[in-house]
Amino acid sequence: MKLYKKINKADLIDYLQSVKDTNSLHYGKNPIIPGNFLLFILEEMYQEFYSMPLSYLKANFCSPAYLNERFCFIFNQNAFQITDRNQTLILKGEWKQ
């Protein structure tokens, strides 16, 4: 499965407030998107296509993700990765039902 998503400032602020994130890297002119936010979005996408909940997830973070970037979420029932528009690997990992 391959899906694309651009994360806007409103989505980021909503997430940061909901988890009470105060990390200065996640705010400002060119904020870094928290890795857990990317994993949250990825899991929501997974749940849209597969009926079984996840019981295990392992992720390796490779590069920072920046606001207003268009991300490519690629996943199947066993593995996932997220890249930016330049195909820079942001994170990759595996999961199990």
Regions found by a protein language model. Give the residues of each.
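Hot-dog-fold acyl-thioester-processing enzymes
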Residues: 1-55
